[in-house]
UniProtKB/Swiss-Prot annotation:
Glycans are attached at residue 87. One of its GO terms (biological process) is defense response to Gram-positive bacterium. One of its GO terms (molecular function) is lyase activity. It holds the Pfam family RnaseA. This is Ribonuclease pancreatic. It is an enzyme of class 4 (lyase). The active site is at residues 37, 144. The gene is RNASE1. The keyword Secreted applies. It comes from Acomys cahirinus.
Length: 149
């Protein structure tokens, strides 16, 4: 009797695991935003090689060089709070963008003109600017970095 139950439960367990497993390793838009744009520690953000190191570490130079990226050096909670601040229109025309009330510490990374994959070389620029992020979900969190102004 015990063996029969095991033989019935095993295929059921396999089905459940097959259904659950794909979602386990999937990066959500909010997780992608954090990976690509958040660096609260910002420990070496003043280094001229900061962008080269971070763009590689955060997997934005796999297969091609991402042309432009911004890292925000503020606590995640402060960046998430932007989603309840001034509503503005996104560059793509959508209405789910929000502008920070105050200037935040950021680092802009721009691909140098003569740089080609796989040798992605970035110009590092440290600034204090307002950020504009697109927000979605429940809870309402940043999912896209739209601009810095």
């Amino acid at each position: 009797m015990g063996l029969e139950k095991s033989l019935i439960l095993l295929p059921l367990l396999v089905l459940v695991l097959a259904w659950v497993q794909p979602s386990l390793g999937k990066e959500t838009p909010a997780m992608k935003f954090e990976r690509q744009h958040m660096d609260s520690a910002g420990s070496s953000s003043s280094s001229p090689t900061y962008c080269n190191q971070m763009m590689k570490r955060r997997e934005m130079t796999k297969g091609s060089c991402k042309r432009v990226n911004t890292f925000v050096h503020e606590p995640l909670a402060d960046v998430q709070a932007v989603c309840s601040q001034k509503n503005v229109t996104c560059k793509n025309g959508k209405k789910n963008c929000y502008k920070s009330r105050s200037a935040l510490t950021i680092t802009d990374c721009r691909l140098k003109g003569n740089s080609k994959y796989p040798d992605c070389d970035y110009q590092t620029s440290h600034q204090q600017k307002h950020i504009i992020v697109a927000c979605e979900g429940s809870p309402y969190v940043p999912v896209h970095f739209d601009a810095s102004v």
